[in-house]
Amino acid sequence: MKNAVVKFLAALAFVILVSGVANAAGEAQRRWERMNQIRQEKFDLVLPEVMRENKVDMWITVSREGHDDPLTEDFGKGYVGSYGYYIFTDRGEERIERAVLGIGTALVEDNGAYDIMTESFDLREFVEERDPQFIALNYAEHIGAADGLSHTSYQKLARDLGKKYADRFVSAEKLTSDFRSRRVASEIAAFAWAGEMSRNIAERAFSNEVITPGKTTLADVAWWMREQQFEINLGTSFGMPSVYITGPDGFVALSNDHVIQRGDFLAIDWGVGYLNFYTDMKRHAYVLKEGETHLPDSIQKA
């Protein structure tokens, strides 16, 4: 009988473990599929428009092992052994040609967004065949997310393509900004979900669920918020949430061991990351004093 019970418990544990793995894989796959949908819509609807508006007929994004470009998530990731390239070329047709050179994994192939996928290529030959007049690269003076090309990678591109094409390099700063900022329907839906998660966690943080006046610290609230992000696999926009007490003279304390008291006016400034979207949200709360049932007039009319 004892052995039967042990076997039953072992089988139950196995079922629970398998079920847990299946659920986790389900969410991972859903996110991958959602990014694929977004990528397809962006490539179909936004990419031709922004390349032509910016008078660019080739856009090269370099991916290097250990050094991902900020746009890698947008373009589909994949394994890079040394150097890999996402190359978009306007060849005069309605659809922009999309190529992935030197970037592997079945996920890149299965996302269905690319016309050309190979790990065996001659970069100069590829570019010469298309003979672009303006080659946009990801270097930028003002926008960090458009400045993913390292100096070393820039030099390598110039050597590999030769002076003729190196003289045609232009910044992709405006192109990147336009591509990222023009949202398609699937992006708006995904961003709305990220915003709702951000709002929900922030408002729970400023409630009796988390805060006990005279006991809970600002750091306690901030760490609780971070824990919620980990539980549902959300990234962070700014690292540790900024949870602070504020007043007429500005910040009194910020995400530290300051104990929250009745009468404190609290604020949160934070954001979550979901897919390649990052929120930026603020919330405020007042901790009622003993006997208070409403916000003081001074706060309501602030």
Language-model features: where?
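Bacterial N-terminal signal peptides that target proteins for export
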Residues: 1-10
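Bacterial N-terminal signal peptides
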Residues: 9-20
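Active-site neighborhoods and metal-handling regions in enzymes and metal-associated proteins
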Residues: 25-302
